[in-house]
Amino acid sequence: MTESVLDYMTRLGRAAREASRVIGRASTAQKNRALQATAAALDEARDELSAANALDLAYGQANGLEPAMLERLALTPARIDSMIVGLRQVASLADPVGAIRDMSYRPSGIQVGKMRVPLGVVGIIYESRPNVTIDAASLCLKSGNATILRGGSEAIHSNRAIAACIARGLAEAGLPAAVVQVVETTDRAAVGALITMPEYVDVIVPRGGKGLIERVSRDARVPVIKHLDGICHVYVSAHADLPKAQKIAFNAKTYRYGICGAMETLLVDQTIAADFLPAMAAQFREKGVELRGCERTRELIDVMPATEDDWHTEYLAAILSIRVVSGLDEAIEHINHYGSHHSDAIVSDHQSQIRRFMAEVDSSSVMVNAPTSFADGFEYGLGAEIGISTDKLHARGPVGLEGLTCEKYIVIGDGQLRGHA
């Protein structure tokens, strides 16, 4: 690449800004044609995708990439199938762009309401998983946004092959190629450039490790949609159905250890701890989960001692911290102090207790008699998600199509003048 990284990224940004005006006014039918054509292109390019992915896997193995990272990097036939299905699912979703709500007449005679519109240009920074290229591109396209995708250097060949399929889909729908651009350089300076171009980029979505997200949050001059940690809790109250609670807690932890909605700390009311914990601990041990507990927990079951650091830790592994609490007040206090505002659950049949938990736990998702593993855009009926936000401005929780849009006021009159009867 002869031009500098900054010049290259500026060129991408300028092209994305111009393309955003085209995709922003594209019809739903045209956007869906692009998605369906991209799905067909992926299906036809399976051999090319597998060959490109093999290059990335070989490079990763030669450079000591961890097995978990290699697993996320692999584009298996099943994952290609999943990408194709995902594109078709997004095409089937309702288009939020242009929806108008809350139209009402004011005393002056004007009508005031809100219209949903695209954000503009979305920059997405992610690691390892090449399927994110399709997930992100499809959601941004359907919501009327141009996007710049900066994947990890370990997936560069896979991402280029996927980008070629997206370009075919856009061309078949008569849309400019710059609607979806994949950053072709592996130079890390590209990230710094992307997050500091507010004239071209409207929002950044980082998806990856804590280090990446902290860097983007610290250095960005563009608004960021993100979450740092998924320190999720399940509180089993004194009013819980204990067999139900055991099933919920087990699923919350063991459905998948590596998801951000996995339970990391189990809180148990002191009045039922002696009845609940022995059977619960036995089930976790049978699954191979390492248990750590507070002093009161260790009086009831044989577990390793939990330290202060454990309450702050997102394990993303088969490790669970357990704390016995005096009641609802201590459970809420613990969650709001140690939690990451992601997803937290209560198991209880007491309605006033449930209402307090829902109102007072400061998290983007609050579950009642359901595991935190449900924290997912597909499970919420969004069809897909670009990520999960634990922030409070713009989007909170799983971010789907609507989260990639915003609202503007529309005002309709018939010649009324302010200050005139």
UniProtKB/Swiss-Prot annotation:
Keywords from UniProt, A to Z, are: Amino-acid biosynthesis, Cytoplasm, NADP, Oxidoreductase, Proline biosynthesis
Q: What class of enzyme is it?
A: oxidoreductase
Annotated pathway, please? Answer: Amino-acid biosynthesis; L-proline biosynthesis; L-glutamate 5-semialdehyde from L-glutamate: step 2/2
Gene Ontology annotations of biological process type: L-proline biosynthetic process
Q: Does the keyword Oxidoreductase apply?
A: yes
Q: Which Pfam families match?
A: Aldedh
- Listed as disulfide-bonded, the cysteine pairs are none
From which domain of life does this come? Bacteria
Extract the HAMAP family matched here.
ProA (MF_00412)
Q: Which family does it belong to?
A: Belongs to the gamma-glutamyl phosphate reductase family.
Q: List the protein's name.
A: Gamma-glutamyl phosphate reductase
Q: Which gene encodes it?
A: proA
